[in-house]
Structures are given as C-alpha cells and as structure tokens.
UniProtKB/Swiss-Prot annotation:
CDD domains: cpn10. Pfam families: Cpn10 (PF00166). GO terms for biological process: chaperone cofactor-dependent protein refolding. Keywords: Chaperone, Cytoplasm. SMART domains: Cpn10. GO terms for molecular function: ATP binding; metal ion binding; protein folding chaperone; protein-folding chaperone binding; unfolded protein binding. This is Co-chaperonin GroES.
Length: 99
C-alpha cells in the first residue's frame, strides 16, 4: 500500500479497512453476500483534533498505525490511487485493538 497524500481536518481520521478473509481455515469459501462490512481498520492519518469552546485544540486519541474497531456505518468511503479508505470522525471509532 502506498501512503496516500491526504491530511484529515479537525477530528477526522483516515483508515484502511482490514478485509474479512474470503476463505476460512477449513477451506470454506465465504461468498460476498455472507460477509459483514468490516469493522476493523488501520489508522493511516489523523487530523489535529477539534477545538473546544475556548479555542484550545483537543488532540485525537488514536495515532497512525493503530488498529481500531469502527462503527459499521460511520464515515465516508473514498478512493485514493485505486485503493479504498474511509474518512470518519473520532466518535465513529469504538475502540483501539491492543496486542
């Protein structure tokens, strides 16, 4: 994957979805109609954070390279150099996957 030349604004985050495997360990092929929309993603870039009512910048909790769980229907899909990414708000990130 080539690093996209895009910088999210405010409290937005650019992520690359981690696709669900098409073939399970037992050799069972999963058809596209049976796959759920992926909920795991890798953080590619983060915005500077949002401003509070006093004009102070509140930094985003995730950082580039973090693996995260995201809301199924949050964000906007974008294509950059033929690859699919999602831009979403920090609120659409449910958790950081550790370990």
């Amino acid at each position: 994957m080539v690093e996209p030349k895009i910088r999210p604004l405010g409290e937005r985050v650019l992520v690359k979805l981690i696709e669900e495997q098409e073939v399970r360990k037992g050799g069972i092929i999963i058809p596209d109609t049976a796959k759920e929309k992926p909920q795991e993603a890798t953080v590619i870039a983060v915005g500077p954070g949002k401003l509070d009512e006093n004009g102070k910048r509140i930094p985003i909790e995730v950082k580039k390279g973090d693996k995260v769980l995201i809301s199924k229907y949050g964000g906007t899909e974008v294509k950059i150099d033929g690859e699919s990414f999602q831009i979403l708000r920090e609120d659409d990130i449910l958790a950081i996957i550790e370990g």
